[in-house]
């Protein structure tokens, strides 16, 4: 279904709805393709950040492969993207492994014990090991794959001098929405820890978290780093598997004000979306999303003193029963009204892949703003989606 779209208002649409904008998506894809060419490396889409399969025909114009971390993602790669996945999982299950193999071109093991258990059943897959460089600049422990006690990867001191003959690659993921300067430092640690095994390998996967589509990303530095790496290790194929970079700033989540309540001088605009259900990273990271037409006011011990003296200041509250399903504060340039739209920017990556139906709250629709200015509804959700999960 396609309906006319007007850039200044969403009033004609039913909210809530995620809207991915085709022109912005193609802009990111074109840039990533250029980076892949200039760095002589393969860039593939990580489904953990973005998996809206009705957009895959667009992706196939720019990239050839994807990365999966489960049987469902591997099947999505083969059945909907049309190419076998580069698959990594923290732990493969016996009853799923053969199906994963059928859907994968590359298969990375998280541990030597998983390798020993499954490698003989891996068929024609190119096999790899995830390694842990014991270095990451990700400050939020929830997202730091190299934090002490991590369950991810094999450290250098636990690798044998001679790798098993069927291990063809290393997988190393230690970034999260990082710049090229961070990768420069990480690469130094990776080579210091693991380069003595590089002669035994055919490929290396530097994982995700490389936010090349962010405006301040230093692409020229990345190109220089890869030129140097290829000079040192000309036989190694290099793979990057970002997720956020593909969908970065490609569209909003549009919500509406359902009610406005006040307690102890704090006004909360209750919306028809939920932070915990539809924007979980906001609470998990946490981070404050950009709201169109509003200024975020830092929430600290002094904020309550500012409330009586700041006009049009609101908390934004979700429509679930979770007490903490709110974030604040935002100052608007006018007084909010019931029925008014509230637009959360950059809500396409790590949202639709992580949403849930807590409280039975209706999932936002998913739409695509096409290049011709029409809005196509890709998916709408209802009671049946909630009921079928509860079978």
Regions found by a protein language model. Name each.
Residues 25, 48, 77, 129, ...:
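Conserved, mostly hydrophobic/aromatic
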Residues 8-9:
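Short, positively charged and aromatic/hydrophobic N-terminal segments
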Residues 191-245, 249:
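Acidic, glycine-rich loop-and-beta core segments that form the ion-binding/anion-interacting portion
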Residues 12-33, 38-42, 50-52, 60-62:
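Conserved N-terminal beta1-alpha1 strand-loop-helix module at the mouth
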Residues 179-185, 213-222, 249-255, 259, ...:
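Short glycine/threonine-rich loop-to-helix capping motif typified by GTGT followed
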Residues 1-5:
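Intrinsic disorder/low-complexity segments
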Residues 41-203, 217, 232:
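Active-site-proximal beta-alpha core segment in soluble small-molecule metabolic enzymes
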Residues 242-391:
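Charged (often Lys/Glu-rich) extended helix/loop segments that serve as interaction or gating elements
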